[in-house]
Amino acid sequence: MADGNTPNTGVAHDQLRSIVERIERLEEEKAALANDIKEVYAEAKGNGFDTKTLRQVVRIRKQDKAERQEQEAILELYLSALGMA
């Protein structure tokens, strides 16, 4: 292990500090975006939309078509097995 007097230690220290600072900035941006999303959902709720359903729609839209169809088929199978379909 290198002692604290080698030139590489300073470089590693600077790189580590840079990485940590970048992560901290991104975490701040992530928190700001999460707050913005929360405000949009609050606006939607104020306009009479069901936020739970909106979240489900957003989650479904992220899926590709095949994945969505597979999950819908499994859900239909389970509901049918329970006599709910």
Swiss-Prot record:
One of its GO terms (molecular function) is DNA binding. Pfam families: GapR_DNA-bd (PF10073). InterPro entries: GapR-like, GapR-like_DNA-bd. Belongs to the UPF0335 family. This is UPF0335 protein Plav_2034. It comes from Parvibaculum lavamentivorans (strain DS-1 / DSM 13023 / NCIMB 13966).
